[in-house]
């Protein structure tokens, strides 16, 4: 049964992919040139939203240009975006997020931005200076990781419902719990000092837990029983000796 579902899904996505090619071909030719069918093989990516309501696929129509199609399977409502990468649906199928070029000339190469789209009305939000992104499992928050600055990063937490953002700088390590409600992270301290461990409630950005230790923390991991982490041990001289 699982194998049959995969075949049906693949066939369905290929059908809507071919339908999307109508915008690639110019004009309304009755007879197609044979070389045009090569475009059918350039399906870069496809998938369904968790609810099965939306389908998305990326088709490359030229040597460098590709288009992301996002279509509602029932209503036929469709969005199109050029030259995107890493599209991701939220778990509740209400949002899609992806990376795209900013369109600006940058000496070091192509500059990218992150675009968040509300599938209900097409409303967009743009975020700059982001290296990676993901939705929390409860679809309440979009976590945007900034570019590395030394051995620390900057996190931007975007509340999807309230449309507000919280910035946390100097993060060394972070992890979100399986429910998507809590964020645990360690903060880089000033030179010569240890880091600190904090736990934030993502719903209202309330700090639930704060711990400081002269030795510091690392290797954070959420489990079904709570947060696990390692505490660095040091001797009387301050030299690191191990972990517990």
Language-model features and meaning:
Residues 59-67, 100-113, 124-127, 145-154, ...:
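A flexible loop/linker signature enriched in serine peptidases of the S9 family
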Residues 10-20:
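Bacterial N-terminal signal peptides
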Residues 74-103, 111-112, 121-132, 214:
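Blade-loop segments of beta-propeller domains
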Residues 72-76, 118-122, 158-163, 201-205:
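Short loop/turn segments that connect beta-strands within beta-propeller blades
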Residues 24-26:
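Boundary at the C-terminal end of the N-terminal hydrophobic targeting segment
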Residues 34-68:
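Beta-strand-rich domains and repeat architectures in extracellular enzymes and scaffolds
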Residues 41-43, 82-88, 127-135, 169-175, ...:
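Short coil/turn segments at the loop-to-beta-strand junctions that recur within blades
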Residues 46-54, 87-96, 133-142, 174-183, ...:
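Blade-terminus and WD-like Trp-Asp/Gly-His loop motifs, strongest in beta-propeller folds
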């Amino acid at each position: 049964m699982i194998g049959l579902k995969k075949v049906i899904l693949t066939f369905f996505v290929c059908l809507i992919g071919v339908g999307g090619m109508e915008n690639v071909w110019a004009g309304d030719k009755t007879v197609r040139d044979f070389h045009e069918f090569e475009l059918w093989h350039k399906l870069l990516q496809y998938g369904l939203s968790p609810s099965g309501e939306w389908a998305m696929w990326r088709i490359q129509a030229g040597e460098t240009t590709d288009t992301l199609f996002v279509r509602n399977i029932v209503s036929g409502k469709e969005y199109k975006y050029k030259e995107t990468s890493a599209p991701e649906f939220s778990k509740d199928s209400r949002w899609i997020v992806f990376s795209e070029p900013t369109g600006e000339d940058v000496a070091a190469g192509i500059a990218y931005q992150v675009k968040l789209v509300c599938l209900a009305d097409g409303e967009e939000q743009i975020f700059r200076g982001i290296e990676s992104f993901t939705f929390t499992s409860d679809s309440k928050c979009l976590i945007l990781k900034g570019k590395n600055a030394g051995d620390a990063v900057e996190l931007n937490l975007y509340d999807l419902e309230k449309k507000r953002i919280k910035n946390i700088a100097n993060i060394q390590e972070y992890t979100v719990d399986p429910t998507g409600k809590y964020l645990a992270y360690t903060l880089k301290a000033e030179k010569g000092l240890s880091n600190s461990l904090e736990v934030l409630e993502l719903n209202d950005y309330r700090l639930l837990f704060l711990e400081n230790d002269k030795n510091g923390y690392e290797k954070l991991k959420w489990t079904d029983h709570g947060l696990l982490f390692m505490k660095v041990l040091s001797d009387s001289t301050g030299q690191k000796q191990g972990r517990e």
